[in-house]
Swiss-Prot record:
Gene: opn4b
Protein's GO biological process: cellular response to light stimulus; G protein-coupled receptor signaling pathway; phototransduction; visual perception
InterPro entries for this protein: GPCR_opsins, GPCR_Rhodpsn, GPCR_Rhodpsn_7TM, Opsin, Retinal_BS
Tissues showing expression: Highest level in the iris, high level in the inner nuclear layer, possibly in horizontal cells, and lowest level in retinal pigment epithelium. Expressed in melanophore cells of the skin.
Bilayer topology term: Multi-pass membrane protein
Pfam families noted in UniProt: 7tm_1
UniProt region (Disordered), positions on chain: 478-501
Source organism: Xenopus laevis (African clawed frog)
PANTHER family listed in its UniProt record: OPSIN
Localization (cell): Cell membrane
Any one cellular-component term (Gene Ontology): plasma membrane
Listed name of the protein: Melanopsin-B
Sites of N6-(retinylidene)lysine modification: 294
Origin superkingdom: Eukaryota
Function: Photoreceptor implicated in non-image-forming responses to light. May be able to isomerize covalently bound all-trans retinal back to 11-cis retinal.
Amino acid sequence: MDLGKTVEYGTHRQDAIAQIDVPDQVLYTIGSFILIIGSVGIIGNMLVLYAFYRNKKLRTAPNYFIINLAISDFLMSATQAPVCFLSSLHREWILGDIGCNVYAFCGALFGITSMMTLLAISINRYIVITKPLQSIQWSSKKRTSQIIVLVWMYSLMWSLAPLLGWSSYVPEGLRISCTWDYVTSTMSNRSYTMMLCCCVFFIPLIVISHCYLFMFLAIRSTGRNVQKLGSYGRQSFLSQSMKNEWKMAKIAFVIIIVFVLSWSPYACVTLIAWAGHGKSLTPYSKTVPAVIAKASAIYNPIIYGIIHPKYRETIHKTVPCLRFLIREPKKDIFESSVRGSIYGRQSASRKKNSFISTVSTAETVSSHIWDNTPNGHWDRKSLSQTMSNLCSPLLQDPNSSHTLEQTLTWPDDPSPKEILLPSSLKSVTYPIGLESIVKDEHTNNSCVRNHRVDKSGGLDWIINATLPRIVIIPTSESNISETKEEHDNNSEEKSKRTEEEEDFFNFHVDTSLLNLEGLNSSTDLYEVVERFLS
């Protein structure tokens, strides 16, 4: 029977094949497979939306695209699978012309929305990684919401076109689903098919490939530049920051690859028909690619369940019945250290003459120092030997992350030693010379100031010294957005922290880091610093 032959039913054109001689078990198998795919897509994408609803830390601006992708995939599964399953049981399309139009319209709308959302994710990751300064204005929640609205409007335009006369929606393949008429060789159908494939599939695919190629080159270039930095701590921080951004990009890349592989067979079939070889396409060759394309709705939650640590953690905590499928990820020490130290940057970043150092709350060596000082009194020789023994491994280990590099010298030592200390604020309280780097506001040049120990053993040298303020600068855009989100959602915690800062900080003196006035002994100093760090 000629598949290209058509007849008119009112204003709609449908295939003249009323019944297709297909074994019942084949239709039942296809229908059952579609039902399973639809069920997994509905449940999986609901879990994704539930995870973003329960975990406020996931509601960052870049993740809005993931939420939009989950919504479109959920609606795709909910509108396509049940109808297709019922039609397979009846061995033909059962909802008539209006149902065919609605079914095909929904499939086109949600499918195009998913593709355009993946394109937006790729562009967003590209800007964040290659142009981090410009990404600040393009990665706000308001701007992200505007982009999502444009994605839906663009998808709606292409989905409405067949209803307005540019091509048409007809049953396809085994007549258990509907799509636009890409088989009939008319100018309207051919032009719509070509424009749809180019503007919705091929051009976005080229843009996505371009974005990820230059993202990879930027990551490699940044990695080389980081290796040239002299500070191990700065190397580690920048490397980890770029790793976080690249991790998000890799998750999106896996989703995009799977999505493209799912829709590629369908695109090939439409192009074969567009080239004038539609008669060579069998009902099976048109139905199977359509089923594979609609199955793309289930891959997003599966990929997130495997790769995304925060998603796994949220599902593991809130859905106990899925704990045997989703393992709880290990805690990210880097993220916790940055969030735990973020309040140090909020008040100190506005000071003009401070040197910005990237540090974290790493473990301190103070306990070892105090254990080796008899009766709590500082002894120059014993303290020097203890500090050298503790810090020498850090000089040999290039992987020691989140460290504060300072130059520590003794006043009378003709050959000062450079050692690398953990980034604890306790290190500045020891009776040793401390060199700090400050920036002159007039000449815009950096200079080194050496703060010597008072030979009398007093604490005035600490109070009067120009110490560098220690702030946290998260170079990662995702860290900035997550920090803003936590700051907005934890106002009570912020007020408590502010009260604590007022107790232990004294910023009315431009050159002091801690309020050390009124201290008479090293024991008092140790207690103040201990309270500050706790």
